[in-house]
């Protein structure tokens, strides 16, 4: 029974795909209804005026207009103001 025990298996070799999170439009930029403004995990930014929030916390424009980033009560809000 002169067998050699099999060697271990490499424990590396995995890599997850990028999630492409972050702010997608700048302050003062003009957007159309449905445009994605922020992709995030959790509420780093809260929806303000004319902005909706998806199931995965994505913020998107509900109306055409200009993007405005605002801070109220230590919370960051993203709003869209019609022109």
Swiss-Prot record:
Entry's Gene Ontology BP terms: translation
Molecular functions (GO terms): structural constituent of ribosome
PROSITE patterns according to UniProt: RIBOSOMAL_L27
Any one cellular-component term (Gene Ontology): cytosolic large ribosomal subunit
Alphabetized Gene3D superfamilies for the sequence: 2.40.50.100
Family matches, as InterPro entries: Ribosomal_bL27, Ribosomal_bL27_CS
Keyword tags: Ribonucleoprotein, Ribosomal protein
Source organism, top-level taxon: Bacteria
Family from the record: Belongs to the bacterial ribosomal protein bL27 family.
UniProt protein name: Large ribosomal subunit protein bL27
Organism in which the protein naturally occurs: Thermotoga maritima (strain ATCC 43589 / DSM 3109 / JCM 10099 / NBRC 100826 / MSB8)
Upper classification of the organism: Bacteria, Thermotogati, Thermotogota, Thermotogae, Thermotogales
């Amino acid at each position: 029974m002169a067998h050699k025990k099999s060697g271990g298996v490499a424990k590396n070799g995995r890599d997850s795909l990028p999630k492409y999170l972050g702010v997608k439009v700048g302050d003062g930029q003009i957007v159309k209804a449905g445009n994605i403004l922020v992709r995030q995990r959790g509420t780093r930014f809260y929806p303000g005026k004319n902005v909706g929030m998806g199931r995965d916390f994505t913020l998107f424009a509900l109306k055409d207009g200009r993007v405005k980033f605002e801070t109220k009560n230590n919370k960051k809000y993203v709003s869209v103001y019609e022109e």
